[in-house]
């Protein structure tokens, strides 16, 4: 798993699309993800919410304020990878969320 990749993720009967947010070198044992809210959810003007772009493999908004540790047993199909521009926006949102600017 690499940073910026998007996957289907299942917990119980709930399915979600997630994006790997942690650095690739940590992902074999300590991956962290952010949930991609559905396309029907409007992206509020909040610095920790990243709207996906036309070239991304999923439509919606990445919610950086709800980071979670990945359970590898819950990971389903790989959907694709975020575009470089969306990944840069994700970087900025993470720095904002952790007050690292």
Can you annotate each of these PLM segments?
Residues 1-101:
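Conserved functional hotspots at enzyme active or ligand-binding sites that engage polyanionic ligands
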């Amino acid at each position: 798993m690499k940073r910026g990749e998007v996957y289907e993720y299942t917990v119980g009967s709930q399915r979600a699309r997630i994006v790997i947010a942690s650095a690739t070198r940590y992902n074999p044992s300590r991956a962290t993800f952010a949930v991609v809210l559905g396309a029907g959810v409007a992206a509020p003007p909040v610095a920790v919410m990243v709207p996906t772009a036309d070239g991304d493999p999923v439509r919606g908004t990445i919610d950086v304020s709800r980071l979670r540790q990945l359970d590898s047993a819950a990971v389903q199909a790989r959907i694709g990878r975020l575009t470089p521009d969306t990944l840069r926006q994700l970087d900025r949102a993470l720095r904002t969320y952790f007050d690292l600017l």
